């Protein structure tokens, strides 16, 4: 399903965001860059379109895009997307991705939230609240099964 955005809640409450379709990723980045007065070259947009998900504040995006995928995925490089009441950048990403998908694919964007519901419930609840404030009330919750 290309009309899908995945919000991952990782250990420590870090939040990562990804959109399946590369063309929607580019349009989402363009909308975010307008909102936050950032600029990205065509090469940076292309590199961003290859990233399945990311988890940094918008002011660190340029630096993240420049890294190789190996360096990008090293422990501690991505600190998570801010999603608290003081700096709720996740709300901006959700809105931008919804608008981008509507523009590019003329369809509604579907959402999935990934995480360990038992351990990450407070953070997952914050993500659900962020979606519901934008009238996104239908989403998939994907939780991992752990062996005993």
Positions of the model-derived regions?
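Long, low-hydrophobicity, acidic/polar, solvent-exposed interaction domains
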Residues: 1-148
